Amino acid sequence: MKFRNMTGINLKIAIPTNRPQAVVNYINALAQLDSHGEAGRCFNPSDYDGLLLPGGWDVNPSRYGKDRIPQETVDDDLDALQFEALDRFLTAGKPVFGICRGHQLLNIAFGGTLIQHLPCAGNHTSLPTGEDNVHRTRIEQNSFIHLIYGAGCTVNSSHHQGVEHPGKGLRAVMYSEDGVIEALEHDSLPVWSVQWHPERMCFSHSRNDTADGSLVFRFFLEQCQKRK
């Protein structure tokens, strides 16, 4: 997929969080593409071009009908503000992109469920050195992620949960080698997500052993620009 020149695009992207310091990598990636990511608790969708749901702690499993397990770390305040932001932006018809926790939260919002602790979690969590694991993926044709990367690519991995059943209208379009759903897209709404961390695969965080994560941000910004 060939992307347009992002110079001067100057889009505003809302990033709902209660820990602004935790979303710096997302803001920096957007800035490299001449766009502004704004961290905060509450947003008016009319003031923004899109919503980015970032990585973070686990979503409380009570939101998808399950009990907590010892391996989970939840933040109910973060859940509340992000679900509220998502509802507002969906109602406004604005593009939404989820990353890691954001990918899982989107799935829950559409009625899907999560695997609370992957049997293969060791293959997907960070290494003892703090570096992300990496793995190959298989990508479905006729999907947003196939337009970007083709039939497959190598991505990073830093999570212990995964999508179990996709929510209403969501389609799984990318899988890890051990079957974990690595990307979702909605069949009619401007909604996309990935389980991995493209912000740690681009610009100053580029890696020789993974795909270029900036292409995900370019895709999202193009979709936001088209809907201005």
Regions found by a protein language model. Give the residues of each.
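Conserved ATP-binding module of the ATP-grasp superfamily
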Residues: Y149, T154
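Short, surface-exposed beta-strand/loop micro-motifs that present aromatic residues
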Residues: V180-D187
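N-terminal beta1-alpha1 cap of cysteine-dependent amidohydrolase-like domains
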Residues: M1-F97, R101, I108-A109, I115, ...
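Short catalytic/ligand-gating loop segments at beta-alpha or beta-beta junctions
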Residues: V155-H160, L184
